[in-house]
């Protein structure tokens, strides 16, 4: 089942749209619908110009020479995909996006990230793409003729809370794209979180704190003692620091900041943040 109201989390479209499956022999119009769905998923919801479309694989698919799985492979190995999500992105960002585009989920753990990094080192880009599409998970989930789709936004048996929350880091709503709809852009988004197996707050894309993006570790600030009398410390994620400007230049070096605050100082810190124009994205116990 979806976690919380699907519309608030930006996944209602995923939840309401059944998997798209191709049945060979259907009309050209239906084939075109499948092709558009594949471009949308594999290219991360990005706009594809007519001149960028893959004319030869499209024609082969319409003639029944390629299955959905093989057309997905053709798109993922294309120069269009390579230029957008591989050569222009940091390595671990490219791997994160491969998981999103080809398996519809975030990477499980550090070991999974390392194994794909090793494939890139030893066998190259095309072998990395094949490792997803030829894997047992792809075959058992999508088979030969189901278009890959976003998964992981529903709570399921054996799914870790880390993987569940990381899904919402990779997918910021059904209308967002892999790069332009994400503040991380081409930099790794999950790398440090996966290494430390750290779950993240699930923030609605429509909320005031939706613009929060985790800053570098060095940007974290610990206020006061290490813990309260009860031993509790809370992590406050803040975004939107735009107040207190001089000549249109903010006094804050970063618009996104993280504070570690003892319980006794939560109220005081809450007031300070709002006085300075910040928006609290989340408050979670550490």
Curated annotation (Swiss-Prot):
It is found in: Cellular thylakoid membrane. Induction: By green light. Signal peptide: none annotated. Belongs to the phycobilisome linker protein family. Rod linker protein, associated with phycoerythrocyanin. Linker polypeptides determine the state of aggregation and the location of the disk-shaped phycobiliprotein units within the phycobilisome and modulate their spectroscopic properties in order to mediate a directed and optimal energy transfer. The phycobilisome is a hemidiscoidal structure that is composed of two distinct substructures: a core complex and six rods radiating from the core. This is Phycobilisome 31.8 kDa linker polypeptide, phycoerythrin-associated, rod. The gene is cpeC.
């Amino acid at each position: 089942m979806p976690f919380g109201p699907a519309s608030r989390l930006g996944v209602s479209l995923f939840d309401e749209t059944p998997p798209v499956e191709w049945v060979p022999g259907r009309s050209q119009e239906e084939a075109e619908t499948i092709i558009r769905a594949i471009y949308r998923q594999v290219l991360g919801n990005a706009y594809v110009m007519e001149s960028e479309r893959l004319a030869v694989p499209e024609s082969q698919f319409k003639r029944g020479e390629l299955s959905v799985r093989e057309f997905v492979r053709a798109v993922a190995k294309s120069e269009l995909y390579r230029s957008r999500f591989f050569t222009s992105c940091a390595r671990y960002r490219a791997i994160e996006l491969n998981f999103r585009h080809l398996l519809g989920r975030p990477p499980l753990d550090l070991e999974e990230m390392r194994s794909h990094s090793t494939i890139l080192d030893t066998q190259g880009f095309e072998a990395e793409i094949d490792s997803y599409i030829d894997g047992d998970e792809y075959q058992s989930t999508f088979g030969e003729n189901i278009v890959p789709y976003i998964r992981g936004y529903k709570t399921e048996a054996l799914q870790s809370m880390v993987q569940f929350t990381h899904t919402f880091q990779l997918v910021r709503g059904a209308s967002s794209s892999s790069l332009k709809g994400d503040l991380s852009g081409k930099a790794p988004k999950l790398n440090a979180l996966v290494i430390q197996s750290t779950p993240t707050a699930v923030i609605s894309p429509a909320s005031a704190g939706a613009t929060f993006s985790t800053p570098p570790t060095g940007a974290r600030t610990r206020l006061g003692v290490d813990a309260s009398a009860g031993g509790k410390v809370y992590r406050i994620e803040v975004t939107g620091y735009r107040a207190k400007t001089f000549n249109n230049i903010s006094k804050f070096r970063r618009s996104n900041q993280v504070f570690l605050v003892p319980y006794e100082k939560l109220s005081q810190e809450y007031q300070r943040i709002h006085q300075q124009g910040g928006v609290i994205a989340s408050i979670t116990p550490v």
